[in-house]
Amino acid sequence: MSADGVTFGQAISKARKALGLSQKELAARVKKEESGGSISPQYLNDIEHDRRSPSSGHLIRQFSGILNIPEDYLFALAGRLPDDLRTDASDPDKVVRAFASFRKTLKE
């Protein structure tokens, strides 16, 4: 959930509706994996109603690209780290320095 109370599912639902897409249409565009089939409309419905979370970073990136929502925002709403940050997150000192820098930036 974001600071303004928006959940991942709400963000997806709002953006989908703004683009005039049905759940079935959006589900058909979102691929499970690089070479996989599409997600089901029921799975999308569960995500939009916050009954399920996206199962992978790949799905989050798909939603981002299709719905024109910043990828980092969706990862934050999903409570996940993007794949490219996971290796950096394994170094506790690096995480502490990054968080301190982030806090300083917010205070400015």
Segments from the language model and where they lie:
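A short, Lys/Arg-rich alpha-helix, primarily the initiator
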Residues: 1-21, 28
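Short alpha-helical DNA-recognition segment
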Residues: 20-46
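DNA major-groove recognition helix of helix-turn-helix
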Residues: 30, 48, 59, 78
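The DNA-recognition helices of helix-turn-helix-type DNA-binding domains
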Residues: 33-34, 51, 78-82
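Short, basic-rich loop-to-helix N-cap that marks the start of a DNA-contacting helix
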Residues: 38, 49-65
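Short, solvent-exposed amphipathic helices
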Residues: 62, 73-76
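Interfacial/linker helices and their anchor residues that mediate assembly or domain coupling
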Residues: 78-108
